[in-house]
Amino acid sequence: MSTPSDSSPRARLAAGIPSVHSSIYWRIGFSVGDQVVLIELPKGNGSEATLILRDIEMGRARQYARVDQVACPADFAPAGGLSGDRETANAQAAAECLRRAGVTHAYGDRTLPLIFVDYARQAGIVVDCEPDRWVNERRQKSPEEIAHLREAQRVTEGAIQLACRLIARASARADGVLMHDGAPLTSERVRAAVDHWLLDQGYVNPMSIIAGGPGASDCHFYGYGELRTGQPVIVDIFPRNRASKYNGDCTRTVVHGEIPAEVVRMHAAVRAAKVAAEKVIKVGATGEAVHRATIASMIASGYAFGLPKADAPTSYCAMTHGTGHGIGIDVHEPPLLDIKGPALLAGEALTVEPGLYRQDLGGVRIEDMVIVTQDGCENLNHLPDGLDWK
């Protein structure tokens, strides 16, 4: 990390594709499929934002982007001209823009491509790395962002309900395989039904977790093949609104038919751990404190924490992951509810998702989304969290 050599104000330098670079999209509110450059120049007590992008996108950017100036690389061509490579030309234009503005110091976050640092330094500009700058700015959600998350979670709950009812209301073949519309009900069929429903609601959906049986003892097992009666099925859905770009994230566990006694016990422990975690969440509490409350609750219920050792019996049952994470434009954002998790801030959106996993049985997980408040948290979920979805 560079050390400033003078006291002059520093400019922010960022570059990326807004459709996939969430921090740039969050800052400018404008999505495009090619790399853009965002430069924020010190001005008075604030800054002036310049967006550099392809000339064919300038009209839309002037209409929709939250910036003060829109330009293309040709507007900041250096004396030797621009490269024929688009990203190199962007880096050259960024350095020239900073040079013309008299900037001697700039900073970027953890996502700034090295080529931009190199061209800026060639122009005599010191570039500092501030890896957490945008991370910290994005943690506290505005009322508008919370409204987007609330709506995304509402729709996500609809998808969860669809999947859990489809499983719970299926018929069972003599060998225990679930049947629906004359064919075996598989994880793939449930996943497809969820995808189609969410598409109609205006959401894009990454590969949902529809994980039944022993395979679900891996907490991130997506689930494949036929679903069976009497086995817990973890349903974890995390879609993104196509318009707002904000995500929902919710998990429930469903069992078709008779629920095994051990699954009932695991579910009660998971539910109690979630309650224990949510009781700790408030402004100033740490993500680590929340996670330790989850672990303490699991241990009090008779379960372990940590991945199984190589010689562990298949009946070993434990929570194997953190308690939760931040959520927003990205489905996984800081902070973590885990060891070394930081102090929580007002307005942060978090998932709370304890789970238990057993190799010979599968897994049980419950996940809600909460908003951190001064004295506690607001749970955005309204869906029941039981095992019977008939």
Predicted features by range, described:
Residues 2-390:
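Active-site neighborhoods and metal-handling regions in enzymes and metal-associated proteins
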